A protein has these predicted regions:
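Conserved hydrophobic/aromatic "anchor" residues
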Residues: 11, 37-38, 91
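Non-catalytic, surface beta->alpha helical segment in thiol-disulfide oxidoreductase systems
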Residues: 84, 89-118
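Thiol-based oxidoreductase modules, predominantly thioredoxin-like and allied folds used
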Residues: 5, 37, 49-56, 60-75
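Short pre-active-site segment immediately N-terminal to redox-active cysteine/selenocysteine motifs
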Residues: 30-33, 37-41, 84
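Cys/His/Pro-rich metal-binding microdomains
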Residues: 43-46
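A short beta-strand-turn-helix
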Residues: 6-33
Length: 118
């Protein structure tokens, strides 16, 4: 499955209700997730994008992988306090999200995805 580009509406249907996030985290997904916060003009984001797309295929049915354009979805970026891009947000089942700054290599991202599905 290809990566899914999230808008505010998609986020509220698949990830969490924005108005509830200030008081509690309640993940709506049925599998762990990864969200890649990016911008089209960002060089490191452009280098990371094909890796994220490959991982979406590799982890299809195990981890849902999303992308959020920070320029188009500023509110979503603010929710996770995205200050630099790329930023990756790992969402385990039943736990709080893990926010990591900067581009990572495929191997490092795979390690973290594998930890999500254990």
């Amino acid at each position: 499955m290809a990566t899914i580009h999230l808008t505010k509406g998609g986020f509220e249907n698949r990830i969490a209700k924005i108005d509830e996030m200030a008081t509690q985290w309640r993940f709506l997904g049925t599998r762990p997730a990864l969200i890649d916060f990016y911008a089209s003009w960002c060089g490191p984001c452009q280098r990371l994008s094909p890796i994220i797309d490959e991982l979406a295929e590799e982890y299809d049915g195990k981890v849902d992988i999303y992308k959020v354009d920070v320029d188009a979805e500023e509110e979503l970026a603010r929710l996770f306090r995205v200050r630099s891009i790329p930023t990756l947000v790992y969402i385990p089942m039943g736990e709080l999200p893990i926010v990591e700054l900067g581009g990572k290599g495929k191997g490092e991202i795979k390690e973290k995805l594998n930890a999500l599905i254990k």
